[in-house]
């Protein structure tokens, strides 16, 4: 379902992308080429800042937003999802947030007020809150990463983890 606000802002979805009929896209959402948005996903850019301004939620080409994912932006802040990025079932991305290209987020992952670099893998049931995760980092399942985390303790993405995330992206893009 595509929803607009009283000002007339409406989501923009590229013709080559697929949005499941049960998904909800609200207001300032931009969906680029060959994006898959699965059942019951909610992508909402419908809050304004103190000046009445609202940044968009941008989803990069060839990305997939799976079943039940919520992407939302606090007080008009931007959310940018890079190209070839996979966000698995029931994950939450809450802006302000920037996600690089080729990133994988496992199911039930929570991201809030963070920047996640290119090629990162954040496994299932993990939280990244209030920090910047450099390119190529690997967050194991059930970990909580925040401003208190010593990033020197975070491993780099392995070839297996990278291949898995790329395979998920390819599989879901085949659906578009």
Predicted regions and their residues:
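N-terminal segments that cap or nucleate solenoid repeat domains
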Residues: 1-40
